[in-house]
Amino acid sequence: MEELRGYLELDRSWQRDFLYTLILQEYIYSLAHDHGFNRTIFFENAGYEKKYSFLIVKRLITRMYQQNHLILSANDSNQNEFLGQKKNLYSQMISEGFAFIVEIPFSLQLLFSLEGKEIVKSRNLRSIHSIFPFLEDKFSHLNYVLDILIPHPVHLEILVQTIRYWTKDASSLHLLRFCLYEYRNWNSRISRKQYISFFSNRNQRLFLFLYNSHVCEYESIFIFLRNQPSHLRSTFSGAFLERIYFYEKIEHLVKVFTKNFQVILWFFKDTFMHYVRYQGKSFLASKGTSLLMIKWKYYLVNFWQCSFSVWSQPRRIYINXLXNHXLDFMXFLSSVRLNPSVVRIQMLEKSFIIDNAINTFDTRVPNIPMIGSFAKAKFCNIFGHPISKPVWAYLSDSDIIDRFGRICRSLSHYYSGSSRKKSLYRIKYILRLSCARTLARKHKSTVRTFLKRLGSEFLEEFFMEEEKVLSLILPRDSYTSQRLYRGRIWYLDIFCIHDLANHE
């Protein structure tokens, strides 16, 4: 921690929330370029020199202002395109450096607050599959759920105003505004939805930081409402928001709105309210009645519109009963169903049979969407019949089998917690037969002839099921391994949803 403090040299700048001194340090841009999107310097020792370069950023900004493509000749389209791309490159370089810089104060605050605790590096070990054990534990006892689509900001200035709550550095805010409007001006002909997609692809780090800050502003109200009825501070609010640098904003909300919301809070008093979110979709579940959920729905819509200047339509929030509706969440279809069980009780000479039903959280693979994804990736047709993949036919046999096997193992790994695996077996069958047809196409043979010559066992090694993997770790005769074979397994080392488009 001391090395980190000395390395970043924040002292007065950190106390005053000034970031512009970091913008003028050359090693920041080297770190942003070398470490990429998924890496961070906060747990690594970077060997860059601590030197200032006032010229590098000034030169880039000057070139961006000088490259005025509006005064160029309209006939020289190639030159316009080149200069425009070059100007866009300068903007991207500065925005990447800014995205790296703006994360530093909030990440430092996170590390300093967790100093001396055992969960210092826990944020690097989080898994999206840790959500499903939470849902199994909580949602099976609840009645209604709000299916919420978090609205996007209608104007870029809303994102800048969100950052203003945390930093007082006007220079950094102007630079952020400059980067955002530069992207929008260069792509003025595209729609707002296309602009968000374009911006997220060009600078994922800055986009995710702005989007997370935008979403967490919405989520701050949930902590406020949960703390008010119970008059107790939530001990898990840090994990609830996955950020702790929103405490100042939350405390401000409590001070400002406590007197005004006493009547409203009486309607929302519910000790069985649970909230979970992944990306732009969230769920708010309760054990209360449908009337309570209706009040929550319209309260959230009005609160977002009045406090965050975001137009949110009520039709983006759905009220569903968990008993008869499936939730489409993180590529799973989840629902709560009754699991009947019969218990026989023997008392002296008389016996009784008691029928009991227990609510269980059921997760299954969405069959139709998966078939559609496979058809889009050219593994099968729209009816689910496997076909060959011609674009992989030029690869070697081992590379073809390795690609198909990697996809199959990843999907099997991700959907291992599904309670109904029939759809998963069908997906494995599609991949297995598509692999065989691709190999047969390469060797100009039929699938039957190809399998007859090499044997169907040559694919087994690459399509090893999770149960076989467990058998290598746990002894066969152990009761634990037998129970794991029959039950569901959530692998907590998964950090992203497998995307078939990456294998195109």
Swiss-Prot record:
The record's section on InterPro entries has: Domain_X, Maturase_MatK, Maturase_MatK_N
Q: Which UniProt keywords apply?
A: Chloroplast, mRNA processing, Plastid, RNA-binding, tRNA processing
* UniProt GO BP: mRNA processing; RNA splicing; tRNA processing
Pfam families assigned:
Intron_maturas2, MatK_N
Question: Which GO terms fall under molecular function for this chain's record?
Answer: RNA binding
* Main location, first listed in the record: plastid
Q: Which family does it belong to?
A: Belongs to the intron maturase 2 family. MatK subfamily.
Q: Would you tell me the protein name for this molecule?
A: Maturase K
